[in-house]
């Protein structure tokens, strides 16, 4: 291999066979049989190949678009329950990508963009549904928190930063980013602070809704390359957001009261008021299914913003039975994840049925939905995961109801069939 020094024996100056530069003009010269190539030409060839791959890959990705049934089946593998929401999402996502695939409208009919609004309590699976869809379609996915966004010119995150994050996920490939999915969480937190427009500017509420309007509907956003700060001399990447699918989600706490007032159900005041008991709590989810655009306006979203989210799907609160299923049934269920961790140590991990029910019951009492399951399982297994790498001969660990309740430690079974509780104090 040559480098940027003279050829030792002959003192002959070497040149790149492609660009003609001498070994003194380049960093490295690679030698072949009577041929030399410099590092600059190698890099140029790499760039040409990368560009060709970029041109081919979008076509290859879009060859086969999964049907709504196939999308739903993929969601079923990872998300428990929420059947209605899965169906709504599958159809909306299928129609969106069908619109992109058939970009040239027939008979002058231009297909409108159908962004999605997900309404459901914390831990009901809103984020997981969006993530799973993106994975199923093999498209870039990014998440944004609406509470961190502010209008341009104010302290906080600019809405265009959302597109920047999406570009980062696909290595600043604009074509790929334009086929991506953006999930904006906590969208209910940017509702207007009061029904009446105020003289003081609401930069984190209505102001953010206004800023998001064009982005969600479709505009060409100018984004600085590689995350640089904007300055006049810089060339921007032009991203067409009309091709990006936006999914907005929020808990919308108290929205059911707005719906009930409209429907004149349970709106009594004083001694004659209807009070919901424990058994009637499930009706809140049922009430949310009756949501109309006017209810969302009253809640604090501006009409123009609601108009950009024509597809609305409501998610129900997960019950104890659903949480038990979430722990064990999906492809990436928590019990399967922790079993895989234990397998790396050569140990089998077993969760008994009563343990799963106890974990689900604890999560229900914390009112965190499926989101709280991981922290419970982590705390149960902490001492065991701490001890096992230092203990020889362990083949199995068993978790039962008493472990979840904190009454005992997980049982360790050794090679010689000896059962012993982990002390957790080693």
UniProtKB/Swiss-Prot annotation:
Q: Which CDD domains match?
A: RecA-like_ClpX
Enumerate the residues binding Zn(2+). 16, 19, 38, 41
Q: Give the transmembrane ranges.
A: none
Gene Ontology biological process: cell division; proteolysis involved in protein catabolic process
Which Pfam families has this protein been placed in? Answer: AAA_2, ClpB_D2-small, zf-C4_ClpX
Q: Which GO terms describe its molecular function?
A: ATP binding; ATP hydrolysis activity; ATP-dependent protein folding chaperone; protein dimerization activity; unfolded protein binding; zinc ion binding
**Which superkingdom?**
Bacteria
Q: Name the InterPro entries on file.
A: AAA+_ATPase, ATP-dep_Clp_protease_ClpX, ATPase_AAA_core, Clp_ATPase_C, Clp_protease_ATP-bd_su_ClpX, ClpX_bact, P-loop_NTPase, Znf_CppX_C4
Please provide, in alphabetical order, the Gene Ontology terms of the cellular component aspect for this entry. Answer: HslUV protease complex
Name the keywords, alphabetized: ATP-binding, Chaperone, Metal-binding, Nucleotide-binding, Zinc
- Can you give the residue ranges of the ClpX-type ZB domain? 4-57
Entry function: ATP-dependent specificity component of the Clp protease. It directs the protease to specific substrates. Can perform chaperone functions in the absence of ClpP.
> Which family is it part of?
Belongs to the ClpX chaperone family.
- Describe the subunit structure: Component of the ClpX-ClpP complex. Forms a hexameric ring that, in the presence of ATP, binds to fourteen ClpP subunits assembled into a disk-like structure with a central cavity, resembling the structure of eukaryotic proteasomes.
The protein's matches in NCBIfam families, at most eight in alphabetical order, are given as: clpX (TIGR00382), PRK05342.1 (NF003745)
Protein name, UniProt field? ATP-dependent Clp protease ATP-binding subunit ClpX
Natural source organism = Shewanella baltica (strain OS185)
């Amino acid at each position: 291999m040559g480098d940027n020094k003279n050829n030792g024996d002959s003192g002959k100056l070497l040149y790149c066979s492609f660009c003609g530069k001498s070994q003194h003009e380049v960093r490295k010269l690679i030698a072949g049989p009577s041929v030399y190539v410099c590092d600059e030409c190698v890099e140029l060839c790499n760039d040409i190949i990368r560009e060709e791959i970029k041109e081919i890959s979008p076509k290859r990705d879009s060859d086969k678009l999964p049907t709504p049934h196939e999308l739903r089946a993929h969601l079923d593998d990872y998300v428990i329950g929420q059947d209605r929401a899965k169906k709504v999402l599958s159809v909306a996502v299928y129609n969106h990508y069908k619109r992109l695939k058939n970009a040239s409208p027939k008979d002058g009919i231009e297909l409108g963009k159908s962004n999605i609004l997900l309404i459901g309590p914390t831990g009901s699976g809103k984020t997981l549904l969006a993530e799973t869809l993106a994975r199923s379609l093999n498209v870039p996915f990014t998440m944004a928190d609406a509470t961190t966004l502010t209008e341009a010119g104010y302290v906080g995150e600019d809405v265009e930063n959302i597109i920047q994050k999406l570009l980062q996920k696909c290595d600043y490939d604009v074509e790929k980013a334009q086929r991506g999915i953006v999930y904006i969480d906590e969208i209910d937190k940017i509702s207007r602070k009061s029904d009446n427009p105020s003289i003081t500017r609401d930069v984190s509420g209505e102001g953010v809704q206004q800023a998001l309007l064009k982005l969600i509907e479709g505009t060409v956003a100018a984004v600085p390359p590689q995350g640089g700060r904007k300055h006049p001399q810089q060339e921007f990447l032009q991203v067409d957001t009309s091709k990006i699918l936006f999914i907005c989600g929020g808990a919308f706490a108290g929205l059911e009261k707005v719906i009930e007032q409209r429907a004149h159900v349970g709106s009594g005041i004083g001694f004659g008021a209807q009070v919901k008991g424990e058994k009637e709590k499930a009706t809140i989810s049922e009430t949310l299914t009756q949501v109309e655009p006017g209810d969302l306006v009253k809640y604090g979203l501006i009409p123009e913003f609601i108009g950009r989210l024509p597809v609305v799907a409501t998610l129900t609160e997960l019950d104890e039975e659903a949480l038990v299923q979430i722990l064990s049934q999906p492809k990436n269920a928590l019990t399967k994840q922790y079993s895989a961790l234990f397998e790396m140590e050569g140990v089998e991990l077993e969760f008994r049925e009563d343990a799963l029910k106890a974990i689900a019951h604890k999560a229900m009492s914390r009112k965190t939905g499926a989101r709280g399951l991981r922290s419970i399982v982590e705390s149960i297994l902490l001492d065991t995961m701490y001890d096992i790498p230092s203990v020889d001969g362990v083949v199995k660990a068993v978790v039962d109801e008493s472990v979840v309740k904190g009454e005992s430690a997980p049982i360790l079974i050794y090679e010689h069939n000896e059962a012993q509780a982990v002390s957790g104090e080693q």
